[in-house]
Amino acid sequence: MNVGSILNDDPPSSGNANGNDDNTKIIKSPTAYHKPSVHERHSITSMLNDTPSDSTPTKKPEPTISPEFRKPSISSLTSPSVAHKPPPLPPSSSSVGSSEHSSARSSPAITKRNSIANIIDAYEEPATKTEKKAELNSPKINQSTPVPKLEEHENDTNKVEKVVDSAPEPKPKKEPQPVFDDQDDDLTKIKKLKQSKKPRRYETPPIWAQRWVPPNRQKEETNVDDGNEAITRLSEKPVFDYTTTRSVDLECSITGMIPPSSITRKIAEWVYANFSNVEEKSKRNVELELKFGKIIDKRSGNRIDLNVVTECIFTDHSSVFFDMQVEEVAWKEITKFLDELEKSFQEGKKGRKFKTLESDNTDSFYQLGRKGEHPKRIRVTKDNLLSPPRLVAIQKERVADLYIHNPGSLFDLRLSMSLEIPVPQGNIESIITKNKPEMVREKKRISYTHPPTITKFDLTRVIGNKTEDKYEVELEAGVMEIFAAIDKIQKGVDNLRLEELIEVFLNNARTLNNRLNKIC
């Protein structure tokens, strides 16, 4: 048996002397070498088993694939052409020892891979950097042909095949993995969100996060509105959230809304009834003030006792009167408390929490009117800090009062609505010279204006000539904000704004009362 017989898989010869001639005939005969068809030469088994020879037997160089290769079907894998091994190529001088690796059947070092499982497993084996470098440097690979790329596809039987693509494709971008999982709860999602990306930082806060500053105070970094009056432009956003509570697992109510306080609702209705009929030209002359004092029973001369323990509205005004004095120790405690708030505010922020104003005035009260007419009460105020002193006169008319009894606090409250009509400057001199004052009192006052709560705190010390000094505490509300809230109710825009303003105004009085309870 000679080399040609081994290559052509011929049976051994009978041993004649012309064996060399037979071998020569086989090599020279054009029909001795059976050329496989195109389909056979490009089948998966032929492509993988007939690997090009290399100097290193353990290397697995990539085969040279025709650009006209098509994906074989399932039927082609089971056809006889797949199992048929094409005859080996005739040996050439350029390849030495190619007969050892020309086929999988004659090569003991390479395992025959003629099943789909073997094909898949063979390409799924991880390759080292040395093997990849050897494959790229293989002499059998055409340098002009692009390196084939393997892609994974799923066939109808849900099995993955390795399909060779001759044209290089761009590397797809890696899609970001989803941050959240369907099984995660809210807390887990928040933690993952914090770990996945950094929060956005703003060099300048967005417009919805900036604090509003009046135009006349934009040059100064302060939170207090300029002006002597407790009037400011406030945001129209609601002050209280009536649909949420601090607890995570509790709801506000069965309806999902927090019902308003009954006392706040009644006081807001009282304010609306007295304010809604005021003419536009007289709105700035309206005063709404809350005075500290005690509701005194006329018969006993003592503070009323209604056998209640919580805040309530007292409506029987005929049997009581309101004493608007506070003790000196209480007056000083309130002054100290407001000064502490101002000091603590300045430690963390620039500007002032309150706008303070000290005054020293002398009030003279006159009653004018003819017989049979309603008397007019005129108050003439002289500013003692100015030289020459300045005189200002107003006609003050009490419209309505509302008594609020606080049995658990030192003081009750009286909510009063009044009209302060200014008297022309030319009439003041005639009033002073032609009439005798009914009462004269000298007072020194410290005013703390806090626009965010539309409140001005007036702490007054009345100096008595023959009696001891008296002390008064009153809170004055910004009426223009109240009128704006009433307009919203009449237009049907916002029905809760008025209640919010009344609640804020009352909360300031309750805060002072709670502070005074500590000194009892």
From Swiss-Prot:
Example GO molecular function: mRNA 5'-triphosphate monophosphatase activity
Job of this protein: First step of mRNA capping. Converts the 5'-triphosphate end of a nascent mRNA chain into a diphosphate end.
Name by which UniProt lists this protein: mRNA-capping enzyme subunit beta
Record's subunit section: Heterodimer. The mRNA-capping enzyme is composed of two separate chains alpha and beta, respectively a mRNA guanylyltransferase and an mRNA 5'-triphosphate monophosphatase.
Catalyzed reaction equations: a 5'-end triphospho-ribonucleoside in mRNA + H2O = a 5'-end diphospho-ribonucleoside in mRNA + phosphate + H(+)
Gene behind this protein: CET1
CDD domains: CYTH-like_mRNA_RTPase
Family: Belongs to the fungal TPase family.
Cofactor: Mg(2+)
UniProt-listed GO biological process terms: 7-methylguanosine mRNA capping
Keyword field: Hydrolase, mRNA capping, mRNA processing, Nucleus
Subcellular location: Nucleus
